[in-house]
């Protein structure tokens, strides 16, 4: 699920934290990728007539096709991917997982009804909601990655937390995930849309956590408290507390301890749920179960791909076309066998700003944030006008 509305808050209040660009801009970088999130996106995106792709034996192949070709695209663009798989979920996440299961059961019922009486759009909508990453999907993707020569790690718990550890240690440039809670785990840089298909033409989003904190004028603890208020995988949001209110509450009161205390005293008009262990949720963001960066499992390297092994697995066992798999495997072999040119930024160290420069920079960020808010407001106003305009009028 990630953090509800966090990207919108960052876009409006800390726009300088977000950079967008083409995938080729990530050339020469090592990136730790949230594998489960990627596999889920492959299962949803790689489809035909609203259904996941299958081979002649009825086995699902969407995840393998996505993993092979999207990884190949990254390697073609000079990126060295490392996939990180989820381990056992924290106990506090069990409520969210139960809700996801319930939603999928409801979606299955909706899908059956849509197939009988609904439109193609209804079938597609409910079909996507039934998607679940299974243990078999994970195991098959790990087998594929091994044959491709691409390293992977199985995290003790949350993959995003493990990605953040590797990014902080400098073992990778960034963590890549669609889940915004990666920032809560203190990954210096989050890349989004990295594993999207080229056809979607979505730019890569590069979000810098230091600039997020600077733009929001918060320390990390306040930022995590904001994310918990917005609603995360560990806790539901407090009823009637939306993104604007959550931001206002943190800015005015500074911490969840103060906010919750005032709510319980009736000084704030919101009601805290009876079981709302925000301290435990915060602790999971600050002290997740992860392998330290110097752990043996974190010593990874990219190997030469097993071309014949890939052909046997994808073509013979999974029914892929050899005319597509073999050239792809050979491209992978060539790309991974080429020593990559180092990025220029690796030769230079950043120079610290003076107090005056910091002050001027902060003011510049405030002006940019204000301009972004005005632009967003104008866009919303224009959309509302267009929606209200009668059809057939210019």
Swiss-Prot record:
Binding site for DNA: 47, 70, 158, 231, 233
Annotated residues for binding of Mg(2+) 2: 179, 181, 233
Post-translational modification: Phosphorylated. Phosphorylation upon DNA damage induces relocalization to the nuclear plasma.
Stretch forming the signal peptide: none
Domain of life: Eukaryota
Matching InterPro entries: 5-3_exonuclease_C_sf, Flap_endonuc, HhH2, PIN-like_dom_sf, XPG-I_dom, XPG/Rad2, XPG_CS, XPG_DNA_repair_N
A Gene Ontology BP annotation from the UniProt entry: base-excision repair
Coarse class of the protein's main subcellular location: nucleus
CDD domains, per database record: H3TH_FEN1-Euk, PIN_FEN1
UniProt-annotated binding residues for Mg(2+) 1: 34, 86, 158, 160
Subcellular location: Nucleus, Nucleolus; Nucleus, Nucleoplasm; Mitochondrion
Keyword Nucleus included in the entry's annotation: yes
Cofactor: Mg(2+)
GO cellular-component term (any): mitochondrion
GO molecular function: 5'-3' exonuclease activity; 5'-flap endonuclease activity; DNA binding; magnesium ion binding
Region listing for Interaction with PCNA, in residue ranges: 340-348
The enzyme's E.C. designation: 3.1.-.-
Family: Belongs to the XPG/RAD2 endonuclease family. FEN1 subfamily.
PANTHER family: FLAP ENDONUCLEASE 1, FLAP ENDONUCLEASE FAMILY MEMBER
Protein name listed in UniProt: Flap endonuclease 1
Protein's organism: Pyricularia oryzae (strain 70-15 / ATCC MYA-4617 / FGSC 8958) (Rice blast fungus)
Gene name per UniProt: FEN1
């Amino acid at each position: 699920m990630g953090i509800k509305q966090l990207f919108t808050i960052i876009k409006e209040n800390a726009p300088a934290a977000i950079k967008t660009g083409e995938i080729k801009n990530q050339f020469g970088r090592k990136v730790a990728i949230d594998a489960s999130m990627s596999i889920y996106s492959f299962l949803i995106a790689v489809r035909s007539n609203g259904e996941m792709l299958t081979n002649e034996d009825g086995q699902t192949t969407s995840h393998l096709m996505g993993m092979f070709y999207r990884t190949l695209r990254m390697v073609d663009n000079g990126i060295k991917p490392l996939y990180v798989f989820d381990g056992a979920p924290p106990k506090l996440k069990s409520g969210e997982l139960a809700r996801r299961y319930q939603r999928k059961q409801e979606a299955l019922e909706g899908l059956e009804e849509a197939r009988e009486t609904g439109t193609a759009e209804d079938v597609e909508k409910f079909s996507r909601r039934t998607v679940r990453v299974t243990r078999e999907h994970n195991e098959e993707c790990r087998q594929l990655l091994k044959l491709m020569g691409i390293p992977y790690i199985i995290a003790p718990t949350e993959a995003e937390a493990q990605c953040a550890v590797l990014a902080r240690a400098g073992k990778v440039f960034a963590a890549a995930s669609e889940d915004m809670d990666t920032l809560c785990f203190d990954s210096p840089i989050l890349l989004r849309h990295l594993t999207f298909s080229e056809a979607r033409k979505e730019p890569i989003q590069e979000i810098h956590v230091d600039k997020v904190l600077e733009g929001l004028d918060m320390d990390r603890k306040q930022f995590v408290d904001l994310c918990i208020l917005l609603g995360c995988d560990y806790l539901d949001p407090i009823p009637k507390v939306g993104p604007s209110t959550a931001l206002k509450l943190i800015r005015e009161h500074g911490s969840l301890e103060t906010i919750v205390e005032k709510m319980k005293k009736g000084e704030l008009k919101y009601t805290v749920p009876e079981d709302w262990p925000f301290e435990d949720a915060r602790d999971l963001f600050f002290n997740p179960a992860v392998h330290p960066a110097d752990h043996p499992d974190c010593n990874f390297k990219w190997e030469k791909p097993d071309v014949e092994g890939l052909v046997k697995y994808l073509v013979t066992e999974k029914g892929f076309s050899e005319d597509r798999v073999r050239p792809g495997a050979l491209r992978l072999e060539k790309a991974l066998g080429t020593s990559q040119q180092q990025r220029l930024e690796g030769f230079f160290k950043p120079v610290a700003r003076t107090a005056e420069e910091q002050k001027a920079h902060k003011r510049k960020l405030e002006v940019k944030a204000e301009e972004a808010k005005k632009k967003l407001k104008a866009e919303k106003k224009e959309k509302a006008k267009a929606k209200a305009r009668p059809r057939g009028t210019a």
